[in-house]
Design a protein with these regions (language model features):
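Membrane-interfacial helix-loop segments of redox and metal-homeostasis proteins
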Residues: 2-163
Length: 163
């Protein structure tokens, strides 16, 4: 059992490191695209396979939901990559705690990230009609973290001992 927990911890660390890297790169792409309209990122493979186009769209900030509800100047209307950095750091840090509260928080934030991934995936497919390799990669990371967090939560539930 301890071997499985150690392996899950290593996997979590790798997933979170990859997530932070992808999120930081998405912030870089967005910043460069705002500075120079001719900027072309490494993830821009074709006109309909362009992460720059996705990150520069209205859905590239606040999941496309914050601005219509809270306004363009809202403190929550940040690039989606900023949410990603916070999410992956939180997952990595809380993952080092063995507490039940950490397990519940990890699961809750993972479910939220899965819902956000489904929303943004639908926007990609039906709204933008674009393929964003970086986005799809982060959705995969989110799904893997959700799987880890469900298993961890189940382990905490079965380890509970009656008083």
């Amino acid at each position: 059992p301890n071997e499985g927990v150690a392996m899950a911890a290593l996997l979590r660390a790798a997933l979170c490191a990859a997530g932070v890297a992808l999120s930081l790169y998405s912030l870089h792409v967005k910043h460069e695209a705002e500075r120079s309209p001719s900027y072309r990122a490494a993830c821009d493979l074709a006109p309909s396979v362009s992460c720059t186009r996705v990150f520069s769209s209205r859905w590239g900030r606040g999941l496309g939901l914050v601005e219509p509800v809270l306004g363009k100047e809202s403190a929550l209307n940040v690039p989606n990559g900023a949410f990603g950095v916070i999410f992956y750091l939180l997952q990595g840090l809380l993952g080092t705690s063995g507490s039940r509260v950490a397990s519940v928080t990890l699961l809750g934030t993972s479910v939220a990230s899965a819902v956000a991934s489904l929303w943004l995936g639908a926007v990609l497919l039906f709204g933008l009609r674009d393929l964003c390799v970086l986005c799809l990669s982060s959705y995969g990371l989110n799904l893997a973290l959700l799987g880890l967090n469900v298993r961890r939560w189940q382990r905490h539930r079965t380890d509970r001992k009656p008083p």
